[in-house]
């Protein structure tokens, strides 16, 4: 439980730095959790079928058959406990979704205005003054702890982690810098070019030759396409490496792009991660969950 609460709060926080990234992650994850909860809530169906309409000639005490009921539908399979757990989750996720949606208007407002107007002047202004409110650590910790609470208290922590696949990838990619194997600057956000209004991968410079362990790690990551290295043309010594975050990785693989485009790529990745999570949870649960399908 401690590890889940720590990861969920920091997983969103370290995948940040561009306007709209933090709140869009929270919105997509909360929608995924809400949809998962709705699968377990029954419809209050109470059908009554008169026997004479069925043409039954058998002797039966009751003149009608009741089908359905409060606890007889949904994936809870009649379990009132499961229904109450996912209702508890909804009590947190629905207000959280409302708060994040309202905040998105101010954090991504100029981008929405850009989408509506589609003018070059608006594009430049949006790049230079992209938001009227910033989430900071507060929103990241609020949303992350809300997810941890519903995952732990409603007993679907494994399913919750599946909705954090981009955050898990970002954490694993960041591990060499987070644990000191590669130098980690204070800020690893993409670098903004004021002349082209494009974002480029930010880099970490090596003033001294990196150790053999660091060089080997960076060479492996470069071979996998996860970072881009700048080497001395004569000695082959590593001079720079792009910071190890998923945002910089997008820029390495897809090239420089505007902040708006980068947020859309992150949003699409988060949505794809949620779709893949549902495939694993309800399509491959027997292989992945090992009998415990919470």
Tell me the role of every PLM-derived stretch.
Residues 2-22:
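Function-critical hydrophobic alpha-helical transmembrane segments in multi-pass membrane proteins
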Residues 3, 20-294:
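Alpha-helical transmembrane segments
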């Amino acid at each position: 439980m401690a590890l889940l609460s720590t990861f969920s709060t920091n997983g969103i926080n370290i995948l940040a730095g561009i306007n709209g990234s933090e709140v869009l992650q929270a919105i997509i994850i909360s929608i995924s959790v809400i949809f998962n909860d709705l699968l377990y809530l029954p419809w209050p169906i109470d059908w009554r079928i008169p026997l004479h309409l069925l043409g039954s000639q058998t002797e039966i005490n009751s003149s009608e058959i009741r089908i359905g009921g409060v606890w007889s539908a949904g994936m809870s399979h009649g379990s009132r406990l499961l229904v109450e757990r996912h209702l508890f989750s909804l009590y947190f996720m629905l207000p959280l979704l409302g708060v994040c949606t309202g905040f998105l208007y101010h954090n991504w407002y100029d981008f929405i205005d850009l989408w509506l107007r589609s003018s070059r002047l608006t594009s430049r202004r949006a790049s230079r003054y992209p938001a009227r409110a910033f989430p900071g650590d507060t929103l990241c910790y609020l949303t992350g702890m809300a997810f941890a609470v519903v995952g732990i208290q409603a007993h679907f922590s494994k399913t919750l982690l599946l909705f954090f696949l981009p955050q898990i990838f970002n954490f694993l990619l960041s591990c060499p810098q987070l644990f000191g194997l590669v130098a980690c600057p204070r800020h690893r956000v993409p670098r903004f070019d004021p002349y082209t209004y494009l974002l480029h991968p930010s880099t970490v410079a090596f003033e001294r030759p990196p150790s053999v362990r660091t060089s080997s790690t960076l060479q492996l990551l470069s071979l996998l396409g996860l970072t881009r290295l700048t080497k001395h043309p004569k000695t082959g010594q590593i001079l720079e490496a792009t910071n190890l975050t998923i945002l910089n990785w997008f820029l390495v693989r897809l090239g420089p792009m505007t902040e708006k485009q980068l947020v859309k790529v992150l949003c699409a990745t988060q949505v794809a991660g949620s779709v893949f999570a549902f495939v694993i949870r309800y399509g491959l649960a027997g292989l992945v969950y090992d009998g415990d399908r919470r």
